[in-house]
């Protein structure tokens, strides 16, 4: 390899660069396969999910494809479907047996990533056994409940509907993030009275 590069350098820089391109592409693919588990079938699956193409999602052959990260989005297929608010694909992946606790690119599992999205997806994930209190493995180390206090949706800071659901299924109201902030404290910091009242009525004084 080094001998070939030296020969190319000595002849012409343009030819040298052109000859290096395939080598660079090959190296990138090899690294991608090692780091992200890249394969063509996986990328077709990820593209199908991004395009909400349910028929193509159904064609995925190997279970392992569902538990790898997509190259372009750097997310798992399940979290990608959640981000697209595509409950049909989420249901399909869960029925197939995808790892519901697998973390995405920022350290959050499926439920954490769903908290500021479709309520029906949140309910579906809980129904399939998602860990209510699973924290981010990186950064703030916050729980889904803490995240629900700052979704900034529909003119409100907190997603009170999701707070209710999480509390109903046993979310730890006293859980703190890396800075020692609870869900109630976060709601108070943002002066979101609806979330404050809801959390206080659930037993936090």
UniProtKB/Swiss-Prot annotation:
GO terms for molecular function: RNA binding; RNA nuclease activity. Keywords: ANK repeat, Plasmid, Repeat. It comes from the Bacteria. PROSITE patterns: ANK_REP_REGION, ANK_REPEAT. One of its GO terms (biological process) is RNA processing. Coiled coil: none annotated. Pfam families: Ank, Ank_2. ANK repeats lie at residues 73-102, 106-134, 140-175, 179-205. SMART domains: ANK. The keyword Repeat applies. PANTHER family: 2-5A-DEPENDENT RIBONUCLEASE (PTHR24141:SF1). This is Putative ankyrin repeat protein RF_p42/RF_pd42. It comes from Rickettsia felis (strain ATCC VR-1525 / URRWXCal2).
